[in-house]
Amino acid sequence: ANGFAGLKPTHGLLSRDGIVPLALSFDTAGPMARHVYDVAAMMNVMVGVDPADEATLASEGRYDTDYTAFLDADALDGARIGVARDFLGYDDEVDWIIEAGLDAMRAAGATVVDVRYPAWLLEAKAQYYQTIRWREFKPQIEAYLADLAPGYPRTLEEMIERARKILAAPPEGGVPNPTRWTLFEQELNTGTPDDYLYRAMYDHGLPLVRANLEGLLDANDLDAIVYPTSPTRPGQAGVYRGSSSPNPSPSATNLANLSGLPDLIVPAGYTSNRLPVGISFFGRPFSEGRLFALGYAFEQATKVRRDPVHAPALPGETIRR
């Protein structure tokens, strides 16, 4: 809900060296910018094998040197796009914006077909994600903290203690998220990467997720699958609404994490109260170039992005659009 373009790349395409870990099985860097062109240009200087991150070895020989070369305003003409209907039907305004975007794709020459994700995957994806993330966080965050300067926490227990102090006396204007503190406790006490459940999920569950999603793309002969990046409109900034909203909805974005496959977000429109809605283009491993082409064509066909009204140019500045 930011009103700009962004890419969650194929896992291993970009180095994670120096990034605070949440779960290295899912973590990745990714560029964000006003337009798809800017995101593609940023990728040119971000890709490459990094000796400090062994995951990038998977990208050797598979990354491109100029992602802007893929940008084509006519890329939707002849493309075959799947729309994941499982993530629509939770917010009328979001649905309307996405349907308008699908109409724009059709008008640009794309064939748009409905697809459905396997029911077991929709039911199990949260458990898969939590099983991996909760068990990886403690050892990985502590390995990261060990390299910091003196004065910083060294263990998850120390992080929890500092979090409690912040929660007891929040900074002025701050709204602490109690769910984050609760997750610290769960991540402290929920197994390790050595236990059988983690090994089962990591060795068998994640490859199964990836195989099913790649199979969905292949079986329907798709260039990409699209869905609302968030099936419901954004909440009010600075107001914590708890772990469940009045109209809870599933999210497709964690499937990109579970599978390690790329997800390009492009502005799709705005709600009646001017909040941004994004559309995700999901594809095969190392298909970033094709996703950039499709996302750029969609961006040029719709031209819906607006500059933020609360951050105008400062005196003497000119914002390049």
Where are these regions (language model features)?
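Structural helix-boundary/capping segments
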Residues: 1-85, 99, 103-107, 146, ...
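Sec/Tat-exported extracytoplasmic proteins
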Residues: 18, 46-50, 85, 109, ...
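Hydrophobic alpha-helical scaffolding
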Residues: 29-32, 74, 87-95, 127-135, ...
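Generic recognition of stable, solvent-exposed alpha-helical segments in well-folded globular domains
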Residues: 34-41, 83, 93-100, 132, ...
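Acidic-enriched catalytic cores of C-N bond-cleaving enzymes acting on peptides and small amides
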Residues: 35-65, 88-123, 133-166
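Short helix-loop capping/hinge segments that flank enzyme active sites or metal/cofactor-binding pockets
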Residues: 70-84, 134-209, 267-275
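A short beta-alpha structural unit
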Residues: 86, 121-130, 164, 234-235, ...
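Glycine-rich, small-residue loops and helix-cap segments
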Residues: 124, 177-321
